[in-house]
Swiss-Prot record:
This is Profilin. GO terms for biological process: actin-dependent intracellular transport of virus towards nucleus; symbiont entry into host cell. It comes from Ectromelia virus (strain Moscow) (ECTV). Participates in either intracellular transport of viral proteins or intercellular spread of the virus. Cellular profilins modulate actin filament dynamics (polymerization and depolymerization) via direct binding to actin through an actin-binding domain as well as by modulation of other actin-binding proteins. In contrast to cellular homologs, the poxvirus profilins seem to bind actin only weakly. GO terms for cellular component: host cell; host cell cytoplasm.
Amino acid sequence: MAAEWHKIIEDVSKNNKFEDAAIVDYKTKKNVLAAIPNRTFAKIIPGEVIALITNRNILKPRIGQKFFIVYTNSLMDENTYTMELLTGYAPVSPIVIARTHTALIFLMGKPTTSRREVYRTCRDYATNVRATGN
């Protein structure tokens, strides 16, 4: 599975529509499994992951020591399994977190990338991973 996580990160880093991405375990250690180095999502800590998956009413979560604003939250819903956010700082960028059976996929678009495109890309990655049982 590790190779698959790194492939997702590699795909995202080659695409100039996205600014940041990470894959984070939410079942056991709640640690970063793969990320674009030296970016915000590479700094995600376990406490931030716990807050995202346990607090359904979270409005302004910290992720990688920065604040974000929740737009929609269906992260723990088995049919949707996504959360949409915006950066809580300028320039405003769209973010989507999608949940697989074992990990969270974080994807941040550039300020010029549409929310819909970030959503579709992130959810597609999660759907493909879910199909493998992970």
